[in-house]
């Protein structure tokens, strides 16, 4: 590594650490010629290949801007957008490639955005997947509803038996007309 001070070619690594959650390596170096120390940061340059064939460096800020447009008017904090962009970057870096198509970045955005805000997800998906009809929206909404329903299914032995509460959800024991049934049932637990 060439010294930035004396331009000498001989330097040695004094310290080496991972930074940015392991996405880069920070090395502290010492020049054998002038004795001065300097720091280098090594990271994998992640490039995105656009549909036009143009290659550009991955930009977390560009992910934030794109998702922010989809979240316009929605109750989504800037911090949540930054976290989503970081999650997307981690996902695409974990693929282990130095170049990836922009399509892969879009796929990496969809999952976290769906969990962040469903309306913003629909907006983003409509552009990303080029929805061309109302039916495309209806299908995506139906998919969202089925995912939401699957995520909220009760678990455990009470779920199989219908649980201790009535279907009305009023806190009364099933088959009981008064709240005393709840107290008696809870005290026997």
Curated annotation (Swiss-Prot):
It comes from the Bacteria. Residues 152-189 are annotated as: Disordered. GO terms for biological process: negative regulation of DNA-templated transcription. It holds the Pfam family Zn_ribbon_NrdR. Negatively regulates transcription of bacterial ribonucleotide reductase nrd genes and operons by binding to NrdR-boxes. Belongs to the NrdR family. This is Transcriptional repressor NrdR. It comes from Saccharopolyspora erythraea (strain ATCC 11635 / DSM 40517 / JCM 4748 / NBRC 13426 / NCIMB 8594 / NRRL 2338). The lineage of its organism: Bacteria, Bacillati, Actinomycetota, Actinomycetes, Pseudonocardiales.
